[in-house]
């Protein structure tokens, strides 16, 4: 059951990343996270 939850979270995270990637602020957010 725990594995399925992790898979679901991974899918959601991938969707969020794709949405952020289309926005101009994505590069700014990535730079902030890398620092």
From Swiss-Prot:
Tissue-level expression: Expressed by the venom gland.
Keywords: Amidation, Secreted, Toxin
Main location: secreted
GO molecular function, one term: toxin activity
Residues with Glutamine amide modification: 35
A cellular-component GO term for this protein: extracellular region
Subcellular localization(s) per the UniProt record: Secreted
Similarity remark: Belongs to the cationic peptide 04 (cupiennin) family. 02 subfamily.
Protein name: Cupiennin-2b
Organism: Cupiennius salei (American wandering spider)
Organism lineage: Eukaryota, Metazoa, Ecdysozoa, Arthropoda, Chelicerata
């Amino acid at each position: 059951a725990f594995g399925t939850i992790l898979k679901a979270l991974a899918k959601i995270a991938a969707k969020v990343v794709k949405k952020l990637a289309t926005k101009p602020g994505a590069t700014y957010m990535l730079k902030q996270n890398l620092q």
